[in-house]
């Protein structure tokens, strides 16, 4: 077998001190080789312990602007599936969005040869085509120890022959970047006689979240993150708030005020609402709660979350660096729904009297376990009750036939 590694360009991965990223001595550097685009990059270094699912993770908008470290020792061995193939709902069949969102990836060992029946190209070719930096030959165990101790950190990947990047702080308008620029419409299958109508607030939604809604019999209208959702909410059977990247306070002047208005509208008190990940955090902020930054976040496919209402443990898929401060939730409104059994952080909240709940983890889980996919069924049960209560009063008058059928960038 040819020694591809020996001919690959040399590269360096540097992790900077959180307290003083501009210091020339305040960093740890690792030597490796480049197998992605021949460009250097900088971003916030985070790590995932997921064993599989690198194509899904790299196309998850929640990772926008970050450098993703994989703890799985060998990455790339099953290649990359088609980014064009779509399912019956016109959703991407294998990826979570049309393009890679991570700024760079760090692996211990890159698999120069791949094999899988869905693969159409190698991970290296994909990264090069998408202009994404990728470095291999890195001691990722040592990297994770650093990130575990000092938290998610400014970092750089420098490729031989490319410019030398400077560490930068996380961007602040990430949701604005990844959100659809105009509403689009995803239709349920024609075999569904009376589909529900869901308004989805796109803060960086994954394809599989939309799929989990439409495959259960919902027509989904996806709106930009800053859309005045209250103006159309009475036309829908439910509101959904998606996942997304970055600090939730970046949406304090956009999504949060709209959600607050939605929660306070008297005629919409019975309207079902479901939020996931960033959507959970934004719902908490709109309700008067606060969020906190975690040291190194939770990014894995095997994190136990306890349902505080039943005592049942769910094994969950997670990807977040912030969490809701459960002690700041208003006593008269929400109560904790799930708790992380590893670090005891909040994993969800549920309203004491209204059909509203949210989770920090990803029940749609692609990749990852499907233990908590039943939460989508619970959401649909809430919409069934809402439809029975409101009857013909809830009618979609928005002209969905004039909308796009996929994300608008």
Swiss-Prot record:
Domain Glutamine amidotransferase type-1: start-end pairs: 197-389
Active site: 277 (nucleophile), 362, 364
Catalyzed chemical reaction(s): hydrogencarbonate + L-glutamine + 2 ATP + H2O = carbamoyl phosphate + L-glutamate + 2 ADP + phosphate + 2 H(+)
Top EC category: ligase
Predominant localisation class: cytoplasm
One of the Pfam families matching this protein, by short name: GATase
Subunit-structure text: Heterodimer composed of 2 chains; the small (or glutamine) chain promotes the hydrolysis of glutamine to ammonia, which is used by the large (or ammonia) chain to synthesize carbamoyl phosphate.
Primary role: Small subunit of the arginine-specific carbamoyl phosphate synthase (CPSase). CPSase catalyzes the formation of carbamoyl phosphate from the ammonia moiety of glutamine, carbonate, and phosphate donated by ATP, constituting the first step of 2 biosynthetic pathways, one leading to arginine and/or urea and the other to pyrimidine nucleotides. The small subunit (glutamine amidotransferase) binds and cleaves glutamine to supply the large subunit with the substrate ammonia.
Protein name, UniProt field: Carbamoyl phosphate synthase arginine-specific small chain
Organism: Kluyveromyces lactis (strain ATCC 8585 / CBS 2359 / DSM 70799 / NBRC 1267 / NRRL Y-1140 / WM37)
Native organism taxonomy: Eukaryota, Fungi, Dikarya, Ascomycota, Saccharomycotina
């Amino acid at each position: 077998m040819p020694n591809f590694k020996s001919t690959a360009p040399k590269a360096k991965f540097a992790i900077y001190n959180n307290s003083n990223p501009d210091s020339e001595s305040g960093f740890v550097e690792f030597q490796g080789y480049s197998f992605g685009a021949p460009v250097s990059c900088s971003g916030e270094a985070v790590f995932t312990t997921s064993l599989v699912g690198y194509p899904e993770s790299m196309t998850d908008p929640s990772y926008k602007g970050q450098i993703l470290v994989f703890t799985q020792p060998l990455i790339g061995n099953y290649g990359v599936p088609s980014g064009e193939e779509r399912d019956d709902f016109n959703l991407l069949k294998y990826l979570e969005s049309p393009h890679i969102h991570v700024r760079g990836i760090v692996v211990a060992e890159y698999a120069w040869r791949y094999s899988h029946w869905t693969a159409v190209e190698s991970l290296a070719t994909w990264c090069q085509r998408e202009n994404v930096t990728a470095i291999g030959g890195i001691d990722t165990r040592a990297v994770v120890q650093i990130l575990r101790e000092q938290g998610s950190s400014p970092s750089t990947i420098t490729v031989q022959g490319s410019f030398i990047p400077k560490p930068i702080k996380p961007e602040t308008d990430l949701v604005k970047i990844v959100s659809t620029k105009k509403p689009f419409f995803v239709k349920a299958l024609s075999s569904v006689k009376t589909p529900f109508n869901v308004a989805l607030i796109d803060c960086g939604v994954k394809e599989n979240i939309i799929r989990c809604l439409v495959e259960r019999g919902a027509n989904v209208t996806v709106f930009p993150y800053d859309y005045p959702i209250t103006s159309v909410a009475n036309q829908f059977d439910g509101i959904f708030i998606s996942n997304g990247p970055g600090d939730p306070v970046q949406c304090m002047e956009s999504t949060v005020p709209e959600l607050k208005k939605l929660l306070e509208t008297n005629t919409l008190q019975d309207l079902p609402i479901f939020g996931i990940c960033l959507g959970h955090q934004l719902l908490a902020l709109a309700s008067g709660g606060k969020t906190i930054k975690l040291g190194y976040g939770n990014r894995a496919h095997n994190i136990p979350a306890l349902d505080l209402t039943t005592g049942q443990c769910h094994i969950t898929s997670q990807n977040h660096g912030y969490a809701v401060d459960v002690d700041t939730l208003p006593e008269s409104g929400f109560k904790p729904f799930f708790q992380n059994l590893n670090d005891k952080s909040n994993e969800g909240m549920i309203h004491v009297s209204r059909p509203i709940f949210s989770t920090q983890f990803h029940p749609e889980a692609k990749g990852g376990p499907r233990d908590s996919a039943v939460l989508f069924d619970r959401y649909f049960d809430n919409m069934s009750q809402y439809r029975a209560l409101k009857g013909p009063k809830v009618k979609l008058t928005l002209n969905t036939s004039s909308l796009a059928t996929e994300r608008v960038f």
